[in-house]
Amino acid sequence: MKIENLCVKYDKNIVIENFSLNLTLGEKVIIYGPNGTGKTTLLKTILGIVKAASGKIIFEDNEIIAYCKQDYPNPEFPITVEEVVAMGIKKQNKNSKEDIKNALIKANALNLQGRLFYSLSGGERQKVSLARCYCQNANLFLLDEPSSFLDTKSKNIFLEQMKNLENQNCSVIAVTHDEELIKNLNWKVIKWNK
């Protein structure tokens, strides 16, 4: 994926100005900067949720994007772990149960089968969210503040999964203000300047 001179505005306010990035297949990148400076907007622009004022985002053929957002709405909604992971499957097929199981194994989350998603800890939810991404067979992962709201134990669990991504044949952009991610991951770091 290539981003060329991306500019994004909300009304007349410039949120992103002349941002460029050339992401190669398999490359892992952390975009580091304070909250409220447009990092999430960048991900939403890549996804096409937010329209760019100018600039280009160029994707490789057959780019499949998986997005892990930082918030979990409707905490009382009774959705199971398997149902969350199944959201990554575009079409129900005869192998969908096997695909879900394989994705949970890949995310080291098979022990969470059968549980309600909102009964899980923050770190466990992030593992399940990664399993959903794996189920999409995505080659580009967008992670929005993936370690936010995690206690120390949950963060350590999730860091293991982030390290596992290093061995996957996918590209990753993680946006964060968490210095611990930078210290614990040997990824390219881009300092976000608004």
Regions flagged by a language model, labelled:
Residues 97-112:
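Conserved ABC ATPase "signature" region
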